[in-house]
Amino acid sequence: MASASYHISNLLEKMTSSDKDFRFMATNDLMTELQKDSIKLDDDSERKVVKMILRLLEDKNGEVQNLAVKCLGPLVSKVKEYQVETIVDTLCTNMLSDKEQLRDISSIGLKTVIGELPPASSGSALAANVCKKITGRLTSAIAKQEDVSVQLEALDIMADMLSRQGGLLVNFHPSILTCLLPQLTSPRLAVRKRTIIALGHLVMSCGNIVFVDLIEHLLSELSKNDSMSTTRTYIQCIAAISRQAGHRIGEYLEKIIPLVVKFCNVDDDELREYCIQAFESFVRRCPKEVYPHVSTIINICLKYLTYDPNYNYDDEDEDENAMDADGGDDDDQGSDDEYSDDDDMSWKVRRAAAKCLDAVVSTRHEMLPEFYKTVSPALIARFKEREENVKADVFHAYLSLLKQTRPVQSWLCDPDAMEQGDTPLTMLQSQVPNIVKALHKQMKEKSVKTRQCCFNMLTELVNVLPGALTQHIPVLVPGIIFSLNDKSSSSNLKIDALSCLYVILCNHSPQVFHPHVQALVPPVVACVGDPFYKITSEALLVTQQLVKVIRPLDQPSSFDATPYIKDLFTCTIKRLKAADIDQEVKERAISCMGQIICNLGDNLGPDLSNTLQIFLERLKNEITRLTTVKALTLIAGSPLKIDLRPVLGEGVPILASFLRKNQRALKLGTLSALDILIKNYSDSLTAAMIDAVLDELPPLISESDMHVSQMAISFLTTLAKVYPSSLSKISGSILNELIGLVRSPLLQGGALSAMLDFFQALVVTGTNNLGYMDLLRMLTGPVYSQSTALTHKQSYYSIAKCVAALTRACPKEGPAVVGQFIQDVKNSRSTDSIRLLALLSLGEVGHHIDLSGQLELKSVILEAFSSPSEEVKSAASYALGSISVGNLPEYLPFVLQEITSQPKRQYLLLHSLKEIISSASVAGLKPYVENIWALLLKHCECAEEGTRNVVAECLGKLTLIDPETLLPRLKGYLISGSSYARSSVVTAVKFTISDHPQPIDPLLKNCIGDFLKTLEDPDLNVRRVALVTFNSAAHNKPSLIRDLLDSVLPHLYNETKVRKELIREVEMGPFKHTVDDGLDIRKAAFECMYTLLDSCLDRLDIFEFLNHVEDGLKDHYDIKMLTFLMLVRLSTLCPSAVLQRLDRLVEPLRATCTTKVKANSVKQEFEKQDELKRSAMRAVAALLTIPEAEKSPLMSEFQSQISSNPELAAIFESIQKDSSSTNLESMDTS
């Protein structure tokens, strides 16, 4: 410490030197010292350092002054509070000095100090005291109006301080407002401009009284309209407030918008520009309140989009060059001060109109059809705009319209809607000829910026409507070639042109381009040879696509590709051989050459084997190996049967070695490559090559990565079919891993299917020790040897499926095995595990093989229905259903008879029936539909909910077999007097909805509204199942319910309310316990709301939606958890709406986070509260991602509370870490 003080006093001494270099070096050294975390200053040193730095601010040398200012930043955080106050006092005094240089340096110093203060949310006392000190001095400096430059600096600092520390100055806000308002009429426009900026920052954190005073002042001044100059300023000010605090100004729009509309009609271009800019900020920041005025705003924008009084467009076809009046091809973004004619300000009005239309189009999804009628044609007509900056904004607005039209949601592609002929997509389709006509002329413009806009537009158009340009390729190709060949084209323009060409090639059929290949190949080949790597990279993508165009392998083509092969090959091989090129170019050269060999390899002659040798080299390189594996997979799968023999000997062992690399994408790619090589090149592979691969397989077959396991098993299946002799090697570790995987509870889906295919392929190869009985013993052994009982029920299902797969492959073995399983079920000494496996195996075998010859099968299974084990009973039920599928005439009448005659076994028998309906073919079931239907209806009023649910599922799945007849019948039962029957039919509808198209869909769409009317049913349970059905439709097939939302949502929202009459007290011994019978239905309603956010967001009134989210934040644990999830989604989907409601959302979140559990509560209560806090904190973290959220005083205060509470701070920190690591993972493309 002493040595530090000595060193610093040395520096201070040098700072008094008459030599400016000494002073500079000493100040620089002090700066270095202050930046060290370890530095500690005693009081005396602090005082001296502060005094010296303040003295150096007045140094004669500018460089020393600048360094001294920089020292203020680290100094503020190293000295005590009263020293910081000394610094601030001195700087404020100096700001009013007569010396201009001292004023300037002091204002920079103040900004530096403010920038170093801890943020308002940290609750720092230092920040509060310093800001209060500065504020008084600044307000008087601003109010004096003596020296404009002082005023401007003071306004600048005030704005800076309000933006960073506005929340700490709440007590000063009224005086700040009082000093700022008069500046809006200052004779100096610069003063007005900075005042507007300061007011913009003030409204983010000021209280309501100050905000109301400000708005009332602006409204009254606007109404007076004293001078055009001040009116312009007030409109600008309102726009700035709206941009910074749109969520607060919304309620005043009813008064503001009529005034702004009125001023649009005044003949003053500058005022018009500001008015339209104000509209833009209202549209973006006050979506709900601006809604009634959107049509007016659109009309005003459409009017002024074409406002060009000083220019005559006459007939645009006459004068090709009219577009580019100023003849510039300057690529810079023009500033506000650049325009063609000093007196003509009309371009700024047109630009404001284009930007405002952009805002409207981007924020009002629900008006898309309307936009295509009015806005789209108007924008297309303005592609001819003569002012380049305006033209860029017109293009941008149209791009926004296209982006809104992208069919990301299923309802946009809904076939029913498409037939109506007025969807956004069909309307866009009809306007494509006009778009192309307008762009065609612009694509030959001198202006680079214009041509880039054209390419972006075409790219987006094709992404939205693939195939849209089929008729227009002849018109567009010359424009693309023009930019590729143009010597004056910038690199970015060429990249955009290539990228556009690539998207067009990918999204249209090859035949469309055949007439243009001759013109396209030379410029693309030239771009592949371009010295700039980004152009090369993009050109290689295009080349790869061109190869597919000139010789498509998936369809017949008469086009002669021969003249182009040499050029395409030569330019690509040059890039493939180059060693020092960019990584992306390397990869794309490999992919492109892979495509050339795949599609044109039979025309390459001797070049083929040389190129394959290069591939072999690339396979040995860690950086290029994955891309090369993918290229080889492509080549090996080519129908041209390319000769790969020259590289297989060396290549296959290299591929085998990749299977042990710790890179998942490489393992998967390699397994695909090996699979296709075995299929197509088995005669060229040796036993040694295959053994090398087999040696690497055991570690890949494991439950830790099911996808890799699935690929490995598929490879083994191919091997069994194509190269059966190699399988003798697998009986050791590979087979052990496979059998281990069959017993894993995680084996299902694609991996299970692959496993079944493998066993069927293996058992017929006749490999030693791998015959039917050997494999059967391996699979079922553990169940019979009591030592290793399988713990998971899923394992039994997997083994049974494998047994059935083996039996299907060897049908002769079937009767004996089935007989053995029947004995296992009958045998009184069999364990439950053995019975379980035997029943499931009988079911799986009987599903595919008719077992009606086994006479005692029925009685054995029915006997198992009486087992004390629930799992055995469930397996018997499944087995009976599955066996029935194998011979419906024999078993289905038997099952129906049993359901009628055996009431005690009804539940299990209904499960058997469900299995039959789910699995049997439609044709097989058709004759029995009426009998099944009649039986089910008898049981749909059963008081037992479990039975009713099975009946409902059967009814729903049965309806799918003959929807025309059965759906109207289901609908008929909605008027049943029994609430049980009504709930059964509503639940049945849920099972008719799936996420893929079905014949029932149009019929369902017509009548689902009737089923959803049960949301008004008097019975609570019927309403609950109606919500569950609605949720299923919203999730799986939103097109069914989109048009019903206006009538459904009020009933849905109604069910989110807590009902006092459904809450009752139950006495449990000495304790009283509260039971809420309405909880389940509220939960169902909130689940529907969550689903609607993903599937029907554009049809929701988000503010009404938020009202109910707010209620949910104060509800039961389960519902709070759901609403926290909703807040996370809403923060991403509609940030501006959430921002408007932020203050109302913060309080319930704070309440959850600060709730304490009673000390004597059970452990479960503590865990629940902990989970609630974590979820609430996730919601808070999501809310804070909304720009400007932390500027809300309540949110800022809550943040301080979190950071000052160690428990909450720790939770919050871990959540932020989690979210950042999740973001990184999602970026990892491998």
UniProtKB/Swiss-Prot annotation:
Q: Which GO terms describe its biological process?
A: cell differentiation; negative regulation of catalytic activity; positive regulation of DNA-templated transcription; positive regulation of RNA polymerase II transcription preinitiation complex assembly; protein ubiquitination; SCF complex assembly
Region feature Disordered, mapped onto this chain: 315-344
Q: Which UniProt keywords apply?
A: Acetylation, Cytoplasm, Nucleus, Phosphoprotein, Repeat, Ubl conjugation pathway
Q: Which SUPFAM superfamilies match?
A: ARM repeat (SSF48371)
Q: Does this entry carry the keyword Repeat?
A: yes
Subunit notes for this chain?
Interacts with TBP. Part of a complex that contains CUL1 and RBX1. Interacts with unneddylated cullins: interacts with CUL1, CUL2, CUL3, CUL4A, CUL4B and CUL5. Does not bind neddylated CUL1. Interaction with cullins is abolished in presence of COMMD1, which antagonizes with CAND1 for interacting with cullins. Interacts with ERCC6. Interacts with DCUN1D1, DCUN1D2, DCUN1D3, DCUN1D4 and DCUN1D5; these interactions are bridged by cullins and strongly inhibits the neddylation of cullins.
Put simply, this protein is called Cullin-associated NEDD8-dissociated protein 1
> Lineage in the entry?
Eukaryota, Metazoa, Chordata, Craniata, Vertebrata
The encoding gene: Cand1
